[in-house]
Amino acid sequence: MTKEFHHVTVLLHETIDMLDVKPDGIYVDATLGGAGHSEYLLSKLSEKGHLYAFDQDQNAIDNAQKRLAPYIEKGMVTFIKDNFRHLQACLREAGVQEIDGICYDLGVSSPQLDQRERGFSYKKDAPLDMRMNQDASLTAYEVVNNYDYHDLVRIFFKYGEDKFSKQIARKIEQAREVKPIETTTELAEIIKLVKPAKELKKKGHPAKQIFQAIRIEVNDELGAADESIQQAMDMLALDGRISVITFHSLEDRLTKQLFKEASTVEVPKGLPFIPDDLKPKMELVSRKPILPSAEELEANNRSHSAKLRVVRKIHK
């Protein structure tokens, strides 16, 4: 595997083991990334089993073709270069009507963060980009330089939950009147100018939340996850499972809400039984999110904010 695609998979065994993999089953890795989850899942399949792996980043697919070569030779893997929000349409096109399990590792992957030219990191000077799909048209540059004040405030509050959203949006407006804001370093410095001294002393980079907000906007991450997870629940076979790893509160709240809605039912009191069409489709496999072990936290700094939630299909 090439150095630039080194990626330490978070919650590797927990995510796949909780899928209760059937050796002859059909499975999906919705977020191929460094292919760690895919590789471990494939190790649990027989040659009759099959994995469909999604990624909109061609570099990730190229890397995975090397890492998963032994399984590809056996015809056990199909790569799909597309946004996972098109999960159902892509799988139907591949002739798949039902799946036995699917895993999601939401957010940006380590290789994307580590590749300076992708413009995801506030720690490395690069053009403002942040596209997970390099063929997409909307970039971080467009958001920062063309969104009006009110739209900037909206995404900074909604996706970054930054209490200085208004001040940062105003400072961006002022800066871009002089010249376009072109690089990650320029943007990070503008954000630093707004934050008071006591905020700058806090743990974590002062630009982290704003960069997260712009990245989510550029890639419509929450909208895509919402659509995809709902499609996955529809496509699951009975007893099939979904594992979702999240890395920030917005992703986790979305996942928790989707799973809660699918696993609970509101019916009038006094009904002698629940009609089939009102029965919940899903069941929570774990009431609380599964967190990384102490060993993983020590070995991989990026696992600190990870949470894993799992549901099982109990009713069609």
Swiss-Prot record:
<feature type="binding site">
    <location>
        <position position="55"/>
    </location>
    <ligand>
        <name>S-adenosyl-L-methionine</name>
    </ligand>
</feature>
<comment type="function">
    <text>Specifically methylates the N4 position of cytidine in position 1402 (C1402) of 16S rRNA.</text>
</comment>
<dbReference type="GO" id="GO:0071424">
    <property type="term" value="F:rRNA (cytosine-N4-)-methyltransferase activity"/>
</dbReference>
<keyword id="KW-0808">Transferase</keyword>
<keyword id="KW-0698">rRNA processing</keyword>
<dbReference type="InterPro" id="IPR002903">
    <property type="entry name" value="RsmH"/>
</dbReference>
<dbReference type="InterPro" id="IPR023397">
    <property type="entry name" value="SAM-dep_MeTrfase_MraW_recog"/>
</dbReference>
<dbReference type="InterPro" id="IPR029063">
    <property type="entry name" value="SAM-dependent_MTases_sf"/>
</dbReference>
<keyword id="KW-0949">S-adenosyl-L-methionine</keyword>
<protein>
    <recommendedName>
        <fullName>Ribosomal RNA small subunit methyltransferase H</fullName>
        <ecNumber>2.1.1.199</ecNumber>
    </recommendedName>
</protein>
<dbReference type="Pfam" id="PF01795">
    <property type="entry name" value="Methyltransf_5"/>
</dbReference>
<dbReference type="GO" id="GO:0070475">
    <property type="term" value="P:rRNA base methylation"/>
</dbReference>
<keyword id="KW-0489">Methyltransferase</keyword>
<feature type="binding site">
    <location>
        <position position="112"/>
    </location>
    <ligand>
        <name>S-adenosyl-L-methionine</name>
    </ligand>
</feature>
<feature type="binding site">
    <location>
        <position position="84"/>
    </location>
    <ligand>
        <name>S-adenosyl-L-methionine</name>
    </ligand>
</feature>
<keyword id="KW-0963">Cytoplasm</keyword>
<feature type="binding site">
    <location>
        <begin position="35"/>
        <end position="37"/>
    </location>
    <ligand>
        <name>S-adenosyl-L-methionine</name>
    </ligand>
</feature>
<feature type="binding site">
    <location>
        <position position="105"/>
    </location>
    <ligand>
        <name>S-adenosyl-L-methionine</name>
    </ligand>
</feature>
<dbReference type="GO" id="GO:0005737">
    <property type="term" value="C:cytoplasm"/>
</dbReference>
<comment type="similarity">
    <text>Belongs to the methyltransferase superfamily. RsmH family.</text>
</comment>
